[in-house]
Every structure is written in C-alpha cells, then in structure tokens.
C-alpha cells in the first residue's frame, strides 16, 4: 500500500534583507536533519525598485550550491571565472561553489516587481573542494507539464513522476540527487506526485493556499513533510508552490556567513583563503 506524505511541521518564512538591502523572506534549515540536502530558501519579493536595486554585489561562497529561480524579474550573474549570465522571468541559474567562487547578482531591471527564489543546497564533503561550476537555464529550457485537472508543473531540477510519466528538468548535476518543482494550480485542481521514499521533502507556498492531504498550507509557509511514496496536493484557491525533494547528506554542517563546511577548522581555512586572495585565482 502506498504511503502518503503528510505535514510534519509548518514553518513561516521570516522577513529579512540580504546583499545591498534586498528584501527577502527566509527559511533556514542548517541544523534541521529533515531539511537536508537543502540549507536555506530565500523568497526574493519586492514591489519597489528601492527594495532590490542594490542587488547582491560581489561576495564569496565555498561548500554549497545555489539555485536561483526567477518568477518575475531580470538579473545578471558575474563571477571570477568569467561567467556572465542573465536570469529572466521563468528562468533559473545554478552555481556549485566548491573550493571557492566570488560572484555578483545585480538587477538589470530598473522598474517592476521582483519575485524569485534562491535555494542553498549543501555539497557533500567529497565535493566541497572541487572546482566551481556555473550554468544558466533560460525560460524555454524549463520542462513544463500542463494538465486541465492537475495544473502546471515546471521542473527546474531533477525528476518528478506523475501518473507513471517521469519529467526531468534541465538541472541534473547537483552533488546529490535533488528535485525542485514549481506547481501552479487553479482552485479545485489537484495532483498526486510519486516521491522517492528516502528523500526529504518540503513544500513552500508562495501564492494562495493548498492542501497537503487534509491539512492546509498558506502563503509564506513551508510544510515539512513526513516520509512517504506519494504526495497529494489540492488547490484551495489559485496557488503557486515550490516543491523541494532531495537525498539527505548525513554529515556535520558548520555554517559561517557564505561558507558551509564540515568542521570549524575548514571554515577558518576558508576565511584565510578568501582573505589571502586565493578565491580570485580559482
């Protein structure tokens, strides 16, 4: 008998700012075992130019992957490896920091609403000192599934299975298997998604409200889900949500600012390497 995933806990996003004053809603899970392999979800949402125009000036990372997904907006990525990429409405970009990267994400847009997400994904110890990587995914490369009763699925990373159909997104190079899906639906539409039972899973609602089984999740809340082989969602009203699933990493997590390693000694080494200018040479 198929075991349905249910809500273990609902976590509200907390308002804060990052970069040069960009307004965000944040859910951090650095020390939550059922959050792994994910570390943090930031919802970037601002109606006023003043709340995003400063962007994210050059800053370092080591030991993580970042996946940025834009619902509405236009930003540019630059890094010390020479990569330049544009992130447009409906598109995504992924970066594996490995042993070190310095990058910026700055707005090209001069007006209009900003709405998107940045997800931090942990790198397993074996990858934390690997060369950095970068990929961008234009809106047309995001794989979509439209269904009149089940709404719209946009698969950004990994694979998802619905009614024996497997849909694979453009990002498949994460250090451990991970899936990120945007599900949008009108009131009354529902969907059942098969989920790998060994994956952790969580669902963030960014618009409207929906039910996981018989439990409701409202805008701005993350539902941490129990283990199971199937996830059933039903839209209470027009809604948008982000489903994150991934293989947990059973390793120590030590977080300091933009660095995530396995020990404090490794964090201290990252700080020394950055201060010595080594990141610029990677």
UniProtKB/Swiss-Prot annotation:
E.C. number(s) listed in UniProt: 1.13.11.24
Keyword set includes Oxidoreductase: yes
Pfam families named in the record: Pirin (PF02678), Pirin_C (PF05726)
Chain residue ranges for the region called Disordered: 1-21
InterPro entries in UniProt: Pirin (IPR012093), Pirin_C_dom (IPR008778), Pirin_N_dom (IPR003829), RmlC-like_jellyroll (IPR014710), RmlC_Cupin_sf (IPR011051)
Enzyme class of the recorded protein, top EC level: oxidoreductase
Catalytic activity, as annotated: quercetin + O2 = 2-(3,4-dihydroxybenzoyloxy)-4,6-dihydroxybenzoate + CO
GO MF entries: metal ion binding; quercetin 2,3-dioxygenase activity
Cofactor binding remark: Binds 1 divalent metal cation.
Pathway: Flavonoid metabolism; quercetin degradation
Residues at which a divalent metal cation binds: 59, 61, 103, 105
Cofactor(s) listed in the protein's UniProt record: a divalent metal cation
Keywords annotated in UniProt: Dioxygenase, Metal-binding, Oxidoreductase
Role: Putative quercetin 2,3-dioxygenase.
Family (UniProt): Belongs to the pirin family.
Record protein name field: Putative quercetin 2,3-dioxygenase VC_A0969
Originating species: Vibrio cholerae serotype O1 (strain ATCC 39315 / El Tor Inaba N16961)
